[in-house]
Amino acid sequence: MSESRWKGALLVAGTTSDAGKSVLVAGLCRMLARRGVRVAPFKAQNMSNNSVVTLDGGEIGRAQALQAAACGLEPSVRFNPVLLKPGSDRTSQLVVRGRAVTSVGARDYIEHRQHLRAVVAEELASLRADYDVVICEGAGSPAEINLRATDLANMGLARAAGLPVIVVGDIDRGGVLAHLFGTVAVLGPDDQALIAGFVINKFRGDVSLLGPGLEQLTAVTGRPTLGVIPFAEDLWLDAEDSLGVVGDAPVGRPAPPIGDDWLRVAAIRLPRISNSTDVEALACEPGVSVRWITDPSRLQDTDLIVLPGSKSTVSDLEWLRRNGIADAIAAHAKRGGPVLGVCGGYQMLGSVIVDDVESGRGAVPGLGLLDLEVEFAPDKVLAQVRGNAHGVPVSGYEIHHGRVRRNGDQPLLHASSGAAEGSIRGAVYGTHWHGLLETDRFRRLLLDDVAEHAGRTGFVTAPDTDVAAIRTAQLDLLADLVEQNLDLRALEDLLGAGAPEGLPAIASTLVS
């Protein structure tokens, strides 16, 4: 197969959220990049509180940053021009080309759609001019036909740009054949004409047993299944959104300890959690068991409590108090137990939060575990950052409205500018920096300190855990799965020629 023939663009849509769109796009991007193809990812609109900061100080969804890494590219706002960050069940912060614009509800958003449609079209056209291949990711499911009129990321994008569409479904959830058929059937004929085939994700067992079902799916839809991706336990880093963060569930695949003791970490699963991926670096370490927790009783036998970031800091702080987790954290800290707060979680650990921006609550008492006062400002801090923590070079990124107006504790680290960052008081640690735990030497120092405070004298940190290498290995595994299990000739043809002419329309009473 001639590598030079890989040219064009396609859209990966899904039967549901968390069906496998993000990982399939990452796998396709990695597979093409390994073949020397100039490839870029694109998600017109993402709804997620897991985000990263680009080199130019913009903000995009973390999944698109991972997909960029799969392509061998730095994150760019071009790859995710519209980002919605939910702050409540009814409102989201609207981020356009990396910058927060306003807070919108569902009805308010309609007012912005024409402008956003133009932004999306411009960015996609620019990427198609600069790269051989652009792999686009849909949002949620195109089957949400109540949203079709305002759709920017699914069939609205495919129709506007003439993109062939592959629909991926998660067989691990059950009912995948019905999901795939139904996704096509509820669409209008013009949308259906762009649906070129299916991919089944997370299959376990003998794939030949699926054959009769796939034959029937082709018979009733007129479209082939282009591949069946097997379930892979080793793929767990960089969850796209909060759907991957399940309360009272383990993070990753814990490896046995090197020494005699495990280190048990409880990460609080906040209702408006953001950048939950911060704790994944801890779960990469042998002998470190990380679980998401929503029940205060589960904190009684933990060694380290982690309060992650939040898109609604004051609201999530009130949730901690209502369900008893705040009291459990205080009791743990009183016993000398280690606590780590990151970004919004760091702000919660302080004495007071003054918030006239997100919640409008004014001065709100924090948990009081750090001598810290934070005040929210309308403009958001967005920056990639570097510094030094106790002789160890560190890096990360900042995404927050809160400004420290007083810090009476020792700093956790110093930024490269010399400015103090974060706090340490006994075994309570806090920082505004996301991604700090991905610095391997710093993470080992922190875990050694946590083990000492927790009395886990038999815990031994691994000397060679490399989070960046683990992430790279997962991207290569994704590419291997794509290469081994998808019809690459059919994908190449779709990229070059678009959806085949004459695909049948499935009659439906739901659409005209």
Curated annotation (Swiss-Prot):
Family matches, as InterPro entries: Class_I_gatase-like (IPR029062), CobQ/CobB/MinD/ParA_Nub-bd_dom (IPR002586), CobQ_GATase1 (IPR033949), CobQ_N (IPR047045), CobQ_synth (IPR004459), GATase_3 (IPR011698), P-loop_NTPase (IPR027417)
Pathway: Cofactor biosynthesis; adenosylcobalamin biosynthesis
Example of a GO MF term: catalytic activity
Taxonomy, superkingdom: Bacteria
Domain GATase cobBQ-type: start-end pairs: 262-442
Catalytic residues (UniProt): C343, H434
GO biological process, one term: cobalamin biosynthetic process
Keywords: Cobalamin biosynthesis, Glutamine amidotransferase
Function: Catalyzes amidations at positions B, D, E, and G on adenosylcobyrinic A,C-diamide. NH(2) groups are provided by glutamine, and one molecule of ATP is hydrogenolyzed for each amidation.
Family classification: Belongs to the CobB/CobQ family. CobQ subfamily.
Protein name (Swiss-Prot/TrEMBL): Cobyric acid synthase
Record organism: Rhodococcus jostii (strain RHA1)
